[in-house]
């Protein structure tokens, strides 16, 4: 649209395809086609939110993020005043572990932005019941997790990204 062209001056076609297979798996495919006469620059990511907790009587704190591989990783937090990820801070979250217990205080500084994970699959689940959701993100470089912690919202967003919001180690010049 003309409105989009004011802030993103490239011609492109974005196709999002959601397919539910016979096993009940939801596949989300994103295709960006350059319809311009020049190279286009872009970042893309997803922001799906999942109910957490799933069942009555459960708490948000009953859930964990379980990664497919053992991780030695941490995250950067979002600075809500500067509206950027603070790349000067790093919180070690996984010390040769696959499991990150979650709670609302963990999200007190907004999103958790992981840039150094080996895993390309993560499950949000209650280990006591085994119930939850698994997200595979083989074509994405990074992943973030977010909830509205201040209101103890009953969901967690699992956000695979190629690119991110502005980071403290870069300028705000997109092009």
Question: What do these predicted regions represent?
Answer:
Residues 18, 44-50:
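FAD-binding core of FAD-dependent oxidoreductases
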Residues 38-44:
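Short, hydrophobic/aromatic beta-strand segments
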Residues 1-23:
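Extended, loop-rich substrate-binding clefts of extracytoplasmic carbohydrate-active enzymes
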Residues 16-18, 26-34:
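Short, well-ordered beta-strand segments enriched in hydrophobic/aromatic residues
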